[in-house]
Amino acid sequence: WVGLTVVWGFVFYFIKLALESFEPVQVAFGRCLLGALTLVLVAAVTRTRLPRGRVVWIDLAVVALLLNTLPYLLFAWAETRVSSVLAGIWNAATPLFVLAFGLLITPWEKVTREKLVGLAIGFLGALVVLGFWDMGNGGDPLGSLACIAATACYGIGMPYTRRRLVHRSEPAVSLMS
């Protein structure tokens, strides 16, 4: 877990670094391209076939839009207005959005008192960490709003993936490629 935390935390620093030489759209495109090439290479090496069928490709396009394209673009644009630290802190709200949208998108997820209390505590904790009452010192509110929109994309995309793709028989690397 520590390794993942370090890697995910540094992503926002590297986005800020990339923005010194590239526009936000170029940073987002580069991230998507690098990820896609890596996954296609893994699929080729493991001789994994790509999925077939129109419906699965539509679902994959929606997932790519929600979990890659939009958040990458929103975070890159946001970091032209807020610090990489603030962007990373906003990203920590992702589990809150996943829980909230998961309850809406996946009908088998039942709303329980524990989930609602967890959501409320998480939201209040995020406000404390972010110093919501003093946002003026943290950067441009539009940059923060872009970060929130990016985490909301993750929050919608993850339960959508669970609902539409998890049950499929194709290997995960095939679906991700």
Label each region the model flagged.
Residues 1-3, 36-63, 76, 80-81, ...:
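Membrane-interface interhelical linkers
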Residues 7-15, 40-91, 124-129:
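Specific transmembrane alpha-helical segments of multi-pass solute transporters/efflux pumps
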Residues 39, 98-100, 122, 136-177:
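Transmembrane alpha-helical segments that form core, pore/gating elements
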Residues 1-29, 77, 137-163:
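Glycine-/small-residue-enriched transmembrane alpha-helix faces in small-molecule transporters
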Residues 3, 29-34, 62, 66, ...:
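Hydrophobic residues within alpha-helical transmembrane segments
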Residues 41-48, 73, 100, 104, ...:
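Structural signature of transmembrane alpha-helix termini at the membrane-water interface
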Residues 26-37, 67, 72-110, 150:
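Specific alpha-helical transmembrane segments that line the substrate/conduction pathway
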Residues 39, 61, 93, 100-101, ...:
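Hydrophobic transmembrane alpha-helices of multi-pass small-molecule transport proteins
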